């Protein structure tokens, strides 16, 4: 079995059970991340989602031989995207805040290095943002997005690197159930959302 990230996706994640309370690390990053070796994805803004939303997510992450389940809170407004992920004991494991200017992260030591905050944000955008925003994020690369009512696929030079499947139609709505598989980096995310405010 494997482990899945998120959101953000996002994304996401082999978290260890013991939270030792070590100091968190803080970083700011530019507005793009690598979603497959050599493939940059420019982060869409909250504005590009087309609506504001607050949602609680149950994320099951499969990475290599590990499976981890965690809860996340996601808030998207035109000016800011916030993702807060909690460890199994309810402690804050990860916070990602993205504005038009930068991505800021606060990551607890229990979060493995394979879980990069930029990828959590990219996974969230690939799953939930409109196809036009995802295509803009891939502009200038050789990658292509294929999108229909129940799935999305990103290919790069003819090979599939990311695949998303949905329980139902997903365009212009925050779907309740989605599954993201990053073939290039070898992880999968099962995403179950409960929208609290829209």
Positions of the model-derived regions?
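Mature, soluble, non-transmembrane domains
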Residues: 23-38, 45-46, 58-60, 91, ...
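Bacterial N-terminal signal peptides that target proteins for export
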Residues: 1-12
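Post-signal-peptide N-terminal segment of Sec-exported extracytoplasmic proteins
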Residues: 40-78
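C-terminal motif of bacterial Sec signal peptides marking the signal peptidase cleavage site
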Residues: 18-21
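Generic marker of residues within folded, mature protein domains
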Residues: 12, 49, 62-64, 73, ...
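Extracytoplasmic beta-rich ectodomain segments of secreted or membrane-anchored proteins
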Residues: 64-99
């Amino acid at each position: 079995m494997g482990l899945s990230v998120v959101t953000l996706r996002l994304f996401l994640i082999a978290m260890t059970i013991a939270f030792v309370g070590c100091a968190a690390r803080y970083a700011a990053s530019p507005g793009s991340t690598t979603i497959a070796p050599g493939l940059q994805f420019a982060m869409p803004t909250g504005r590009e989602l087309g609506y504001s939303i607050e949602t609680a997510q149950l994320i099951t992450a499969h990475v290599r031989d590990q499976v981890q389940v965690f809860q996340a809170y996601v808030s998207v407004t035109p000016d800011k995207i916030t993702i807060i992920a909690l460890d199994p004991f309810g402690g804050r494991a990860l916070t990602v805040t993205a504005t038009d200017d930068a991505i800021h992260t606060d990551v607890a030591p229990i979060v493995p290095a394979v879980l990069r905050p930029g990828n959590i944000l990219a996974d969230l955008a690939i799953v939930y943002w409109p196809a036009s925003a995802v295509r803009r994020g891939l502009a200038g690369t050789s990658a292509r997005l294929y999108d229909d009512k129940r799935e999305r696929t990103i290919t790069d030079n003819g090979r599939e690197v990311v695949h998303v499947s949905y329980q139902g139609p997903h365009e212009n709505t925050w779907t309740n159930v989605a599954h993201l598989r990053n073939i290039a980096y070898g992880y999968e995310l099962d995403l179950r959302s409960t929208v609290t405010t829209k």
